[in-house]
UniProtKB/Swiss-Prot annotation:
Binding site for ATP: 34-42, 57
Biased composition (Basic and acidic residues): 402-417
Gene transcribed to yield this protein: Taok2
UniProt keywords, alphabetically: ATP-binding, Cell projection, Coiled coil, Cytoplasm, Cytoplasmic vesicle, Cytoskeleton, Kinase, Magnesium, Membrane, Methylation, Nucleotide-binding, Phosphoprotein, Serine/threonine-protein kinase, Transferase, Transmembrane, Transmembrane helix
Cofactor needs: Mg(2+)
Record organism: Mus musculus
Primary location: membrane
Name of the protein this chain belongs to: Serine/threonine-protein kinase TAO2
PANTHER family on file: SERINE/THREONINE-PROTEIN KINASE TAO1-LIKE PROTEIN, SERINE_THREONINE-PROTEIN KINASE TAO2
Enzyme class label: transferase
Family, per entry: Belongs to the protein kinase superfamily. STE Ser/Thr protein kinase family. STE20 subfamily.
The enzyme's E.C. designation: 2.7.11.1
Length: 1240
């Protein structure tokens, strides 16, 4: 599908092949409007090529959102081209003409919602099963090809002439599954479609949910939550439980089928293939169920159209004499042909109908637009009542004849005839548009033509034309239904635009989120690519460095190997040279030895001359051979030893060289490893930096997504709130119009008698009728007060609640004088009782009857958060589904009258306490001074102090200076006391005499104490001086504190601290630290206690119980760490930080320390008790009994501290506690009590 290009452009060959090039106005004739919806209109037409009856859906793609409309048309055409199934609508083609797409499909008689509209009652279960079976077969075909319909409802389940059930209106369908678009009709939407933008995608199971809602619609004539605003219904569907059948007469198979379709979790919901095997759709039923239903509906449509035609004929015949140039017609009996033609006269367009101005206004939405028309009652008696109401409305509207005639006049030009049910475009020159070659002609009967405008043809000719072709336009839609859809389409354009705008806004939000996510994904990919390139560059550099290092190491190894070989050759040559020298020396020595031995042998032979010469020669030869043999052996031994030595030295040298090479290799490997470690560290640091950068980027992106989602949610909530307010205004206006119409329909006798009300009868007060009977009595409603009642019922309950609180008891009324006083206090003046008396005081109709059809919806929880808690509390009054709204108002005392302003709660509390509110005037009776009585003069005995402050400043300065001097020299303390006493006495009012008396008393006391202590008690003078200084210090401090002379103790302290600087600085530091500890102490103490408890909880259970027995763990600490363990019920008492009441210094009281010591002792006592309990468990029973009788053993009370049991035991205990004991039955309270949700 092309994303760009203007609407209607066929430059793309894939788009151009979807549409035919022919002119549709030349191919199709006899166009008649048979339905209307948000997309446009649906027309009945005939193909001039083969006289085939078709349905044409005209969709305009001009105006606003033209590109979106064009894309929707392309998507629907592509979807229809792929359908090849008997239970889906057959596609004939699509044509373009003047920015309008003509989508040609096969013609069907009507939809399942038309059956409900015609019969005014639900379908039978066997009929619902047949319709559901056909729809399921179509859905199974779609789902097998990964298609989703997404708009399954009774208005889109069509019935054909052969009795086949077909799925239609594929404008919301999706070719690909899964999908995530917000598409469909609100009341039939599945929860996952509503939450698709937030929670993900959905598949074909959404059609199964819509089919379940459609079953409820066919069984109850309307879907659940239909009396609620569409926006509120979306929230209820997503949040509340699944709906179910209300009536109890349906079979268990049907209930199980609906419950299976309406499973809230999509995974638990069966597919269409599985539902085709359900017992509800497979059980036996007559094969002609659909045909019988269609035939019965046709008969009902014929009867309704006959009735409507008789009403129209009566109006035309009554108005005919008043027309210009019209003659009074004479009524005559209708022939059978004309009677059969009556129901189809409106659809054929042969009469200028006034039906458009006489239709009953409906609150429902058109079946082919957004929902089925279900604004009717459920039985045949209600149908008769509605027909009577229609007759009364038509009689009332007879007075508006001229305006109605102007609306029904035929338009000139193309001879377009405007009727209640169709708009027929007749081309000039075509006399008969209804000839059917496949239908026999009927002989027309005589019929008196009604009065018609001059531009129209004769009525008898049109009737004859219709009689010849009455069967070629078979339908199960009444003329009033088609007309009502046309009127609702014109009137409810704002509602459709609102809902389409809401869907468009949701789609735009989804596109915006997808665009944002794609942009952020691109940023992440770019960031990841940049980091990857950086990492690869670093790794490439590391590889280059490693290669250089490897080449260097290789060169070093080769150089060392060559050097080692050269050294080895030198070493071998050196050893070989030495061995050669040794061998040459040996050979020289052997030669010398040989010569010497030869001479010795010769000398020995010469000494023995008797030996023959031959023997001498032989003996000498043997001796020489022996000598040579010994020399050869000695040479061979030397060579062997040299070879061994050579090999040994070579092995040793090679070993030494191998060790050196190994050491070198180790050094090189260590260098290589160090280099690789450095590179890995740098790479790890780079990866950490990249990870941190990636984390920051993802965090920023998540924040951007969350901000966008929050903004889009805020806009969505604002839009929904605005739509709800508009819905309230629209319903209020409709209710006012309905009330006005009902008041106009009242008999004139009642209106006349309303003005003749006796004077003795009571009238309506400001807050309700003064003569209040029982709440169930019918209270008349005047036309002048309709706005007040409607406004009270439709949106201003929050003002009635304070009114009821003011009145006290519900339903009480006020006297006229009280009403006048309240009106003056609140700023509103109630009118006189005569003004509240209306013409409808004796009307005999009940408001509760009209309120049964109009229910004001209750808001969802999200909308309550938007509107506020006060408005949400007021809206809760509308959630009474089965009650009567007006009866509730009468019971609560909410009747017509001016709305009182609520009294603030603060003023009520003040009045209850008996005190006057702030701002009220006081009189002399309350203790206030009167302006007539002069104020009393001040008493004369009081001394008038001089205005000069110089003496006081001098005395304070003198005392401060003396105090500073006393701090450095403690011997001046008595002098300071002696000066302080007369100064304070002089300031007290005694003057100089009092000062002298105080000085004398001080000196006498000092002298007397000295005489008594030093003379009588023989106290040392030094000790007396120290005692006098201490007494004087205490006296000075007490007197200065009593008189407020803060300079004295401050001077003493400053001088003392300056005299001892080594002590002053630590004291200042301790003071600062104490202040910080005092501020941060509770928080630190809580943190340390929590840390201590966490450390204890990580220990084994045995150790924890031991510490718990020692008093190391208390209830308070555990409850502070685990607040929910101290709950008493289903709610947790979470600790809330609150300032402690009382003196914070009480925590350091000695009693607190004693309490802690007592807790530790108690813990050790508990430990001893446990040990004694274990010891007692080992004793025999008689010994335990004796110890218990002596008082040494006592029973043990269970502790409130939770035990740390294993998880398996806790689960077993929880499951065992939830199970009831065998043989017990749960009480009524436990059965009826609703399970509370877990505390969050």
């Amino acid at each position: 599908m092309p994303a760009g290009g203007r609407a209607g452009s066929l430059k793309d060959p894939d788009v151009a092949e979807l549409f035919f090039k022919d002119d549709p106005e030349k191919l199709f004739s006899d166009l008649r409007e048979i339905g209307h919806g948000s997309f446009g209109a649906v027309y009945f037409a005939r193909d001039v090529r083969n006289s085939e009856v078709v349905a044409i859906k005209k969709m305009s793609y001009s105006g606003k959102q033209s590109n979106e409309k064009w894309q929707d048309i392309i998507k629907e055409v592509r979807f229809l081209q792929k359908l090849r199934h008997p239970n889906t609508i057959q596609y004939r083609g699509c044509y373009l003409r003047e920015h309008t797409a003509w989508l040609v499909m096969e013609y069907c008689l009507g939809s399942a919602s038309d059956l409900l509209e015609v019969h005014k009652k639900p379908l039978q279960e066997v009929e619902i099963a047949a319709v559901t079976h056909g729809a399921l077969q179509g859905l199974a075909y779609l789902h097998s090809h990964n298609m989703i319909h997404r708009d399954v409802k009774a208005g889109n389940i069509l019935l054909s002439e052969p009795g086949l059930v077909k799925l239609g209106d594929f404008g919301s369908a999706s070719i690909m599954a899964p999908a995530n678009s917000f598409v469909g009709t609100p009341y039939w939407m599945a929860p996952e479609v509503i939450l698709a933008m937030d929670e993900g995608q959905y598949d074909g199971k959404v059609d199964v949910w819509s089919l379940g809602i459609t079953c409820i619609e066919l069984a109850e004539r309307k879907p659940p939550l239909f009396n609620m605003n569409a926006m509120s219904a979306l929230y209820h569907i997503a949040q509340n439980e699944s709906p179910a059948l209300q009536s109890g007469h349906w079979s268990e198979y049907f209930r199980n089928f609906v419950d299976s379709c309406l499973q809230k979790i999509p995974q638990d919901r069966p597919t269409s293939e599985v539902l085709l095997k359900h017992r509800f759709v497979l059980r036996e039923r007559p094969p002609t169920v659909i045909m019988d239903l269609i035939q019965r509906t046709k008969d009902a449509v014929r009867e309704l159209d006959n009735l409507q035609y008789r009403k129209m004929k009566k109006i035309l015949f009554q108005e005919a004499p008043n027309g210009p140039g019209a003659e009074a017609p004479e009524e005559e009996e209708l022939t059978p042909c004309s009677q059969e033609a009556e129901p189809y006269t409106h659809r054929a367009g042969t009469l200028t109908s006034l039906e458009s101005s006489h239709s009953v206004p409906s609150m429902s939405i058109s079946a082919s637009s957004q929902s089925s028309s279900v604004n009717s009652l459920a039985d045949a008696s209600d149908n008769e009542e509605e027909e009577e109401e229609e007759e009364e409305e038509e009689e009332e509207e007879e007075e508006e004849g001229p305006e109605s005639r102007e609306m029904a006049m035929m338009q000139e030009g193309e001879h377009t005839v405007t009727s209640h049910s169709s708009i027929i475009h007749r081309l000039p020159g075509s006399d008969n548009l209804y000839d059917d070659p496949y239908q026999p002609e009927m002989t027309p009967g005589p019929l008196q033509p009604p009065a018609a405008p001059p531009t129209s043809t004769s009525s008898s000719a049109r009737r004859r034309a219709y009689c010849r072709n009455r069967d070629h336009f078979a339908t199960i839609r009444t003329a009033s239904l088609v007309s009502r859809q046309i009127q609702e389409h014109e009137q409810d354009s704002a509602l459709r635009e609102q809902l389409s705008g809401y869907k468009r806004m949701r789609r735009q939000h989804q596109k915006q989120l997808l665009a944002l996510e794609s942009r952020l994904r691109g940023e992440r990919e770019e960031h990841s690519g940049r980091l990857q390139r950086e990492l690869e560059a670093q790794r490439a550099g590391f590889g280059t460095e490693a290669e250089k290092l490897a080449r260097r190491h290789q060169a070093i190894g080769e150089k060392e190997a060559r050097a080692a070989q050269a050294e080895e050759r030198k070493f071998q040559q050196h050893i070989l040279g030495q061995q050669k020298k040794e061998l040459a020396a040996l050979l020289e020595a052997q030669k010398r030895t040989y010569k010497l031995r030869k001479e010795q042998l010769k000398e020995e032979l010469q000494e023995n001359p008797s030996t023959p010469k031959r023997e001498k020669a032989e003996w000498l030869l043997r001796q020489k051979e022996q000598l040579q043999q010994c020399q050869a052996e000695e040479e061979a031994g030397l060579l062997r030893r040299q070879r061994q030595y050579f090999e040994l030295q070579c092995r040793q040298y090679k070993r030494k060289m191998l060790l050196a090479r190994h050491s070198l290799d180790q050094d090189l490997l260590r260098e290589d490893l160090n280099k690789k470690q450095t590179q890995k560290d740098l790479e790890c640091a780079l990866l950490l930096r990249q990870h941190e950068a990636t984390r920051e980027l993802e965090l920023r992106q998540l924040q951007a997504v969350q901000r966008t989602r929050a903004e889009l949610t805020r806009l969505q909530h604002q839009t929904e709130l605005g739509n709800q307010l508009e819905y309230n205004k629209r319903r209020e206006q409709e209710l006012r119009q309905k009330h006005a119409a009902q008041v106009r329909q009242q008999p004139k006798s009642l209106k006349v008698r309303a003005g003749q009300l006796p004077m003795g009868l009571p009238a309506t007060g400001a807050l309700g009728p003064l003569s209040t009977g029982t709440p169930s009595e019918e209270q008349p409603c005047s036309s002048g007060q309709e706005a007040i009642l409607d406004q009270r019922m439709l949106g201003e309950e929050e003002e009635a609640v304070p009114e009821r609180r003011i009145l006290g008891k519900e339903g009480t009324t006020l006297e006229p004088e009280e009403q006048r006083i309240l009106g003056e206090e609140m700023g509103t003046f109630s009118s006189s009782p005569q003004k509240h008396r209306s013409l409808a005081n004796e009307e005999d109709w009940d408001i509760s009857e009209e309120m049964k059809e109009i229910r004001v919806p209750s808001l969802a929880s999200q909308e309550r958060n938007i509107i506020g808690q006060e408005e949400a509390a007021a809206w809760s009054l509308w959630e009474k589904e089965g009650g009567n709204l007006v009866d509730v108002e009468f019971k609560l005392g909410w009747v017509q009258g001016p709305v009182l302003t609520p009294v603030p709660e603060e003023e009520e509390e003040e009045e209850e306490e008996g005190g006057a509110p702030i701002g009220t005037h006081r009189d002399p009776g309350d203790g206030c001074p009167s302006p007539d009585i002069p104020p009393e003069p001040p008493p004369s005995h009081l001394r008038q102090y001089p205005t000069s402050q110089l003496p006081g400043l001098l005395s304070h300065g003198l005392l401060a200076g003396l105090s500073f001097a006393v701090g450095s020299s403690s011997g001046l303390l008595p002098l300071l006391l002696l000066l302080l006493l007369p100064l304070l006495a002089a300031q007290g009012g005694g003057g100089l005499q009092a000062a002298l008396l105080a000085l004398e008393v001080g000196l006498v006391g000092l002298g007397a104490s000295y005489l008594f202590l030093c003379t009588a008690l023989h106290l040392p003078p030094g000790l007396f001086l120290l005692l006098a200084q201490g007494t004087a210090l205490l006296a000075v401090l007490s007197l200065s504190w009593r008189r407020g002379l803060m300079g004295v103790p401050l001077g003493l302290g400053a001088a003392w601290l300056l005299a001892w600087p080594s002590l002053a600085l630590p004291l200042a530091a301790m003071a600062a630290g104490g202040k910080w500890v005092r501020q941060q102490g509770p928080q630190m103490r809580r943190g340390i206690s929590r840390l201590w408890l966490r450390i204890l909880l990580r220990l084994s259970p045995m150790v924890f119980r031991a510490l718990q027995g020692c008093g190391a763990v208390g209830d308070r600490g555990l409850f502070a760490l685990y607040p929910k363990t101290n709950k008493n019920g289903f709610r947790s008492r979470l600790p809330v930080p609150w300032p402690r009441q009382g003196n914070p210094r009480t925590t350091q009281h000695p009693l607190a320390q004693l309490t802690r010591v007592w807790a530790v002792c108690k813990g050790w006592n508990w430990r001893l008790a446990r040990a004694s309990h274990r010891l007692a468990s080992c004793l025999p029973p008689w010994a335990v009994h004796i110890l218990a009788s002596w008082g040494l053993l006592k029973g043990e009370r269970p502790s409130r501290i939770p035990r740390l049991l294993p998880r398996s035991q806790r689960r077993l205990g929880l499951s065992a506690s939830r199970q009831l004991p065998p043989g017990t039955v749960a009480g009524r309270r436990s059965q009826t009590r609703r399970t509370l949700p877990p505390w969050r």
